[in-house]
Each structure stands twice: as structure tokens, then as C-alpha cells.
Amino acid sequence: MLKVIKKYRKFITFLMIGLVYTLAYPATAHAMHIMEGMLPPRWCIFWYAVSLPFFIYGLYRMYKIVNSGVPNAKVMLALCGAFVFVLSSLKLPSVTGSCSHPTGVGLGTVLFGPGVMSVLGVIVLLFQALLLAHGGITTLGANEFSMTIVGPIVGYAVWKLCRAMKVSRSVSLFLCAMFADWSTYVTTAFQLAIVFPDPNGGVAAALIKFLSIYAITQIPLAIAEGLLTVIVYNLVISNDLWKESALQ
């Protein structure tokens, strides 16, 4: 454990700085994490019900990983959770009083597969909702579905497709993280559009409006997230702390 900490002391320092910053300057978010009270009760219940099977499967995957005996598995789980927390807490102003931020789910998706991200994501979402006024409890199901279910599944599909096509590991990982981020925001835009349809154009028009709002900041953020994810992943692999596809 001490060897791992020494090798990753710079990255751990970065994570701690991000943690201190987010705790010291909590800001209310109204973008990818749908805020408390934003959704009607029936939709809150619906998204909880839809997300529950994925969460249960994620618990099963988490149990298998923790008891797998694979070296550094627990450390890598903690790293992936911290990566999601720090990146998803780095909020940037967007339009109409909202904000945008990375999701950070690409790293864990590639290391462990999309299933475990539903559990890690819920832990992060609960922490942010309770301590950082970021998201909410009633909207937890909707936020979980977009960020920790759809995002990782899309990212994992992109990763597997790229690797099957013999695309380089770094490019595959970059595309995985980027598309996981974008698909999260597309899902959130759809979740809001069906609740707040445009008076004239309906759900389709509302979806276009929400997507156009998020795209201003989220497109460059997703690209930056992809690059950072590649750097961290290559750091992990190059130091022999993990093997590709070890527990996917």
C-alpha cells in the first residue's frame, strides 16, 4: 500500500486539492445533476425503479471484485471513486443559471466494466447531494441513470468496439470517456424534456433546447475529460498496478 501511495503521491495530492476546493466552495448545480424538487414525484419514483436493477447488479459486481484476490483491486476501486467525485465536482458556469462538469466514469468503466459504476456513482451522488448541494435525494434515481448507468454502458460499448477494430488503447480510452460524458448529458436533456416539454414543439423541441444549452460547455469539457482519463489510465498500467481487462 505504501508503495502505491508513493507512486501516486502527485495524483493523490491533486485529488485532495480537488476535495478541499469542493468542500470549501460548494455551489448549487442545475445541470447534469438534476436539482432537488426539479422532477415531479411520479418521475422520481420511475427513475428510482429503472435504476434499481442496475444498482443491485453493481453490488454483485462490487462483491466479486472485492473478493477476487486480484492485486490492487480495492485500491483501484477507491481510485475510480475518487476520480468520479473530483471530476464531477469541478463545476463550470453554463447558461440560464446552470453549470456543467465532467463525469469521470470512463476510468472505472474500462478498469472494471460498467456494472460497478452504478454503485460508485451512487456513493458520489449521495455525498454531493448531502454535503455540496449538488443534485438531490428525490432526483437521485434520475441522476444515477444518466451518469452511472447510461454513461458507462455507452462508454464501455465504444471501448469494446474500438478495441475490436484494433484502435490504439489511448484513442479507445479517450473516445470511451468522451462518449460516456456526452451520453450522460443527452440522457439528462431527455429526462428534463419529457417533464418540461416546449409549449409549441413538444418534447423534441425541448430536447433540442436543453442539448444546445449543455453543448456550449460540455463538448470541450468531455474532450478534456478524455485526455485526463488517458493520462491517469496509462499511469496505472505503466506502473504495473493493473492489467487491461483484469476484471471487466
Swiss-Prot record:
Kindly state a single biological-process term from the GO annotations of this entry.
Answer: cobalamin biosynthetic process
Keyword annotations: Cell membrane, Cobalamin biosynthesis, Cobalt, Cobalt transport, Ion transport, Membrane, Signal, Transmembrane, Transmembrane helix, Transport
Q: Does the keyword Cytoplasm apply?
A: no
Its pathway, per UniProt, is: Cofactor biosynthesis; adenosylcobalamin biosynthesis
Does the keyword Transmembrane helix belong to this entry? yes
What topology does it adopt in the membrane?
Multi-pass membrane protein
Recorded GO CC terms: ATP-binding cassette (ABC) transporter complex
List, alphabetically, the InterPro entries matched. Answer: CbiM, CbiM/NikMN
Q: What are the boundaries of the signal sequence?
A: 1-31
Gene Ontology molecular function, alphabetical? cobalt ion transmembrane transporter activity
Report the principal subcellular site: membrane
Q: Which domain of life is it from?
A: Bacteria
Show the stretches that span the lipid bilayer.
Answer: 39-59, 75-95, 107-127, 139-159, 173-195, 213-233
Describe its assembly.
Forms an energy-coupling factor (ECF) transporter complex composed of an ATP-binding protein (A component, CbiO), a transmembrane protein (T component, CbiQ) and 2 possible substrate-capture proteins (S components, CbiM and CbiN) of unknown stoichimetry.
The entry sums up its family as follows:
Belongs to the CbiM family.
The role this protein plays is:
Part of the energy-coupling factor (ECF) transporter complex CbiMNOQ involved in cobalt import.
The protein depicted here goes by the name: Cobalt transport protein CbiM
Gene that encodes the chain: cbiM
